Amino acid sequence: MAEISASMVKELRERTGAGMMDCKKALAEVGGDMEKAIEFLREKGLAAAAKKAGRIAAEGVVESYIHGGGRIGVLVEINCETDFVAKNEDFRGLAKDIAMQIAAAKPEFVRREEVSADKIEKEKEILRAQALNEGKPEKIVEKMVEGRIEKFYKEVCLLEQPFIKDSDKTVQQVINEIIAKIGEKVDVRRFVRYEMGEGLEKRQDDFAAEVAAQIKA
């Protein structure tokens, strides 16, 4: 079996808009052949964004969300290609959902490529220490660390998080569904999340559960 590198997965993701794990699985299925992987994703309905990936998305919206009582605030910039789509109900609904996702799930980055090598290495060191403290054999520790790093990405990277309205999908998969529906590239560019009293000693409330409950109400 051909070795599937991170750069191959990244390229396939950029060309198709499919999720990171979907890209990795596709490459594994076709022995690392990029063009066959694209065809595989299209056949599976996971590459609706393929033809849009190279387009420029310079329109869009900055969506805001304030959680009840003004305790959490989010601003997120989501881009599309035309002003017409920026006013589209589905696009605006997506922007609102993503803003609420950020409020509830506390991502630190949009995508895994934004996570610095230093942060990843530091996280790996912590995970190695945890595995060894659990009494795991050293020979399997590295495999365990790689698996836990994937879990780390799903926690801190917005696009890889389970979508708060449907945990069977990732945020990226939801975006791809909108891309297929509206026919334009959609890209989350950046976000900022504020939480009242963040960094200060205070009573701990489960804000994520509150936001999730509000969404389902």
UniProtKB/Swiss-Prot annotation:
* Gene Ontology CC terms: cytoplasm
Its keywords, alphabetically, are: Cytoplasm, Elongation factor, Protein biosynthesis
The entry's localization annotation reads: Cytoplasm
Region entry Involved in Mg(2+) ion dislocation from EF-Tu: which residue ranges?
A: 82-85
Q: Which Gene3D superfamilies match?
A: 1.10.286.20, DNA helicase RuvA subunit, C-terminal domain, Elongation factor Ts, dimerisation domain
Q: Which Pfam families match?
A: EF_TS
Could you tell me which SUPFAM superfamilies the record lists for this protein? Elongation factor Ts (EF-Ts), dimerisation domain, UBA-like
Offer an example of a GO molecular function term for this protein. Answer: translation elongation factor activity
- Its main subcellular localisation, reduced to a broad class, is cytoplasm
- InterPro entries linked to this entry: EF-Ts_dimer_sf, Transl_elong_EFTs/EF1B, Transl_elong_EFTs/EF1B_dimer, Transl_elong_Ts_CS, UBA-like_sf
Record keyword Cytoplasm present: yes
Q: What does the similarity note say?
A: Belongs to the EF-Ts family.
Q: What does this protein do?
A: Associates with the EF-Tu.GDP complex and induces the exchange of GDP to GTP. It remains bound to the aminoacyl-tRNA.EF-Tu.GTP complex up to the GTP hydrolysis stage on the ribosome.
PANTHER family per record = ELONGATION FACTOR TS, ELONGATION FACTOR TS, MITOCHONDRIAL
Its protein name is: Elongation factor Ts
Which organism's genome codes for this protein? Desulforamulus reducens (strain ATCC BAA-1160 / DSM 100696 / MI-1) (Desulfotomaculum reducens)
The lineage, from the top, is:
Bacteria, Bacillati, Bacillota, Clostridia, Eubacteriales
